């Protein structure tokens, strides 16, 4: 290829090889064909075609085409990148995208690559179309645009990217900024389907209420008291169910019988089908969700077609409606009528709704031995459904005043009752209020376990209960965990005595509970407490009258009740309190309190056991004032603060 002649010869041969397509390599060449490239052929063909610049032209065209394709590819990639950034954050894509397509694209972004369809599909027309507001937020139908390839004329689809977002083809993006601005649609706006469902759900209850009023002639809300929470419990419910199948509506009464104590069923027909109105009282309290699930399973009706609220219990018109409709032939009744309907419709129940009587409330508190104000208020309010006076109490606007007055009067009556009884009568009264079945041996065995002789203890207890001077105080002394406090507390609980604490000794009123007590306990007396007793309470230990200071009241002179003291200090072993030695009787508890293998006390010091103990030792304790009770009756008159009433006549 150094000389021009040889190069031109090969070029001519190249054209001959292209023309001879069917000759194979290795075939023999005929002799009549000359491929030597002589001077004669070169001179004959040299002036026919000027091909000196052909290789350079082809090279330039190939370079330009490759450069153009590279530029177009970069432009396409840039346009795709810009659109991806623009629509990032809207994984749902267009609002018209179907749910299945959205799920598929979320699970596999490359699912569109495997599609065998033509891809030319438009979104279907929706049932509720959004009106065009003119602000460019209208939903538009998207078409797949075919973008022809610039190299070999092959088209490709470029309208949806991997994330399901609509993008613009390179041809449209190169036409100017106006085409891109037309595609600037806010994809994160609320879908029209969600808004429609929301409107339908909000308007559903209004539509049901309107249809109910049209069919039954009165408003549903006039019969019920709405509950805001679906989890609030109630026993009575008013249920309206729309579009019930006739066969299920007829069998509803028998289906509900196993769940309810009372059923009032009405069925009317309208354009929507059968509307069932039922007043039910369940056997136990239920909330709205439970009632919805029950009716949905029995009637095969969705919860959106139900109205469920509790009835108005204090509305006379509502009670009259249920009473009047129960007498007609459109209603089916099962069970006894609820008391709130009877109370407002029947004559006798109306007469029972009298005014509140405080004396009945006081009598109830006295008979049940309830003196705490909060306990009186709570337990008496629970009787509102069975007691007419309690119902009147609940209707009153002065409940707090009534509770305070009731508690005050009940405490006064109880204090007067205790003061009227002797110690023997009071112990007998406490025994009457205690159950039988106790074992007196547990108390005796515990005293024997602590090495306390039973007969001296019994003699001291007899003098202690009588309040004999110098015998009015018993001290239980011993190391910790020997059962002193347990023994003393069990006795005070049975006698229903009071407990005083030295921690309140800085107050002038810390001894005021002794004014109304039959027996008192001072637990865990320390050396400082013994010093205080030696200085100020010698007369109290003697059993003589003392003067007590009460808050907001005058000083009260009373005889100190029998006083039981527990202590880890033996006052008789210290001469500092030598003036107390003759005023107290000390019993020593030295052994730890015994427990069984389960951790329970080995000796049960209960009210039943104390009742059995006093019954067994009644004569030895000289509690013989009421020996003739069986013949003469009870000497204590039964308390009654309610005046007699004549039966009311109509």
From Swiss-Prot:
Sequence positions that bind ATP: 478-485
EC number(s) from the headed UniProt entry: 5.6.2.4
Keywords noted in UniProt: ATP-binding, DNA replication, DNA-binding, Early protein, Helicase, Host nucleus, Hydrolase, Isomerase, Isopeptide bond, Nucleotide-binding, Phosphoprotein, Ubl conjugation
Motif (Nuclear localization signal): 84-86
Covalent crosslink: Glycyl lysine isopeptide (Lys-Gly) (interchain with G-Cter in SUMO): 559
A GO term, aspect molecular function: DNA binding
Catalysis performed (reactions): Couples ATP hydrolysis with the unwinding of duplex DNA by translocating in the 3'-5' direction; ATP + H2O = ADP + phosphate + H(+)
Chain positions found as Phosphoserine: 90, 94, 108, 121
Keyword presence, DNA-binding: yes
GO annotation, cellular component aspect: host cell nucleus
Domain SF3 helicase residue range list: 452-602
Entry's Gene Ontology BP terms: DNA replication
Gene3D superfamilies cross-referenced by the UniProt entry: 3.40.1310.10, P-loop containing nucleotide triphosphate hydrolases (3.40.50.300), Zinc finger, large T-antigen D1 domain (1.10.10.510)
Main location: host cell
Known role: ATP-dependent DNA 3'-5' helicase required for initiation of viral DNA replication. It forms a complex with the viral E2 protein. The E1-E2 complex binds to the replication origin which contains binding sites for both proteins. During the initial step, a dimer of E1 interacts with a dimer of protein E2 leading to a complex that binds the viral origin of replication with high specificity. Then, a second dimer of E1 displaces the E2 dimer in an ATP-dependent manner to form the E1 tetramer.
Quaternary state and interactors: Can form hexamers. Interacts with E2 protein; this interaction increases E1 DNA binding specificity. Interacts with host DNA polymerase subunit POLA2. Interacts with host single stranded DNA-binding protein RPA1. Interacts with host TOP1; this interaction stimulates the enzymatic activity of TOP1.
Family assignment from sequence similarity: Belongs to the papillomaviridae E1 protein family.
Protein name: Replication protein E1
Organism: Human papillomavirus 73
């Amino acid at each position: 290829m150094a000389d021009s002649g040889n190069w031109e010869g090969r070029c001519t041969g190249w054209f001959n090889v292209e023309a001879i397509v069917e000759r194979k390599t290795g075939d023999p060449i005929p002799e009549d064909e000359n491929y030597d490239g002589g001077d004669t052929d070169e001179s004959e063909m040299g002036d026919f075609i000027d091909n000196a610049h052909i290789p350079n032209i082809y090279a330039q065209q190939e370079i330009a085409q490759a450069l153009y394709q590279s530029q177009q590819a970069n432009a396409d990639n840039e346009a795709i990148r810009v659109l991806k950034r623009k629509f990032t954050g809207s994984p749902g894509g267009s609002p018209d995208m179907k749910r299945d397509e959205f799920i598929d694209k979320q699970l596999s972004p490359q699912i569109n690559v495997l599609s065998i369809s033509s891809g030319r599909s438009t979104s279907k027309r929706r049932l509720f179309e959004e009106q065009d507001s003119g602000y460019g937020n209208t939903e538009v139908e998207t078409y797949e645009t075919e973008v022809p390839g610039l190299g070999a004329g092959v088209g490709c689809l470029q309208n949806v990217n991997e994330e399901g977002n609509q993008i613009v083809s390179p041809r449209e993006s190169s036409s100017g900024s106006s085409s891109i601005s037309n595609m600037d649609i806010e994809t994160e706006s609320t879908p029209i389907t969600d808004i429609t469902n929301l409107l339908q759900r909000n308007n559903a209850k209004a539509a049901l209420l309107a249809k109910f009023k049209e069919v039954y002639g009165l408003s549903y809300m006039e019969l019920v008291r709405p509950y805001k929470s679906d989890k609030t419990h109630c026993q009575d419910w008013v249920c309206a169910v729309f579009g019930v199948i006739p066969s299920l509506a007829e069998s509803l009464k028998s289906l509900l019988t196993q769940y309810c104590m009372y059923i009032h069923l009405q069925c009317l027909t309208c354009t929507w089908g059968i509307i069932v109105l039922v007043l039910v009282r369940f056997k136990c309290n239920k909330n709205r969700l439970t009632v919805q699930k029950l009716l949905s399973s029995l009637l095969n009706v969705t919860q959106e077609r139900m109205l469920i609220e509790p009835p108005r219990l204090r509305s006379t018109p509502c009670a009259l409606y249920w009473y009047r409709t129960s007498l007609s032939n459109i209603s089916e009744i099962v069970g006894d009528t609820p008391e709130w309907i009877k109370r407002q419709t029947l004559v006798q129940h109306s007469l029972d709704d009298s005014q509140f009587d405080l004396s009945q409330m006081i009598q109830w508190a006295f008979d049940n031995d309830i003196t705490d104000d909060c306990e009186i208020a709570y337990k008496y309010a629970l009787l509102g459904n069975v007691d007419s006076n309690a119902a009147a109490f609940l209707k009153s606007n002065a409940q707090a005043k009534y509770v305070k007055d009731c508690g005050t009067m009940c405490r006064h009556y109880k204090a007067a009752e205790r003061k009227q009884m002797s110690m023997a009568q009071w112990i007998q009264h406490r025994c009457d209020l205690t159950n039988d079945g106790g074992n007196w041996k547990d108390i005796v065995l515990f005293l024997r376990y602590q090495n306390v002789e039973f007969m001296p203890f019994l003699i001291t207890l007899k003098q202690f209960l009588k309040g004999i001077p110098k015998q009015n105080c018993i001290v239980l002394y011993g190391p910790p965990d020997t059962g002193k406090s347990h023994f003393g507390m069990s006795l005070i609980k049975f006698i229903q005595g009071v407990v005083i604490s030295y921690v309140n000794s800085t107050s002038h009123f810390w001894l005021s509970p002794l004014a109304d007590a039959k027996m008192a306990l001072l637990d865990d007396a320390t050396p400082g407490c013994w010093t205080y007793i030696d200085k100020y309470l010698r007369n109290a230990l003697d059993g003589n009258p003392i003067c007590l200071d009460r808050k907001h009241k005058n000083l009260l002179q009373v005889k100190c009740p029998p006083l039981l003291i527990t202590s880890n200090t033996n006052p008789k072993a210290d001469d500092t309190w030598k003036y107390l030695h003759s005023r107290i009787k000390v019993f020593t508890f030295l052994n730890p309190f015994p427990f069984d293998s389960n951790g329970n006390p080995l000796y049960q010091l209960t009210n039943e056991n104390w009742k059995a103990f006093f019954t067994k030792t009644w004569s030895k304790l000289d509690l013989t004032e009421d020996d003739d009770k069986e013949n003469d009756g009870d000497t204590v008159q039964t308390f009654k603060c309610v005046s007699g009433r004549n039966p009311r006549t109509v």
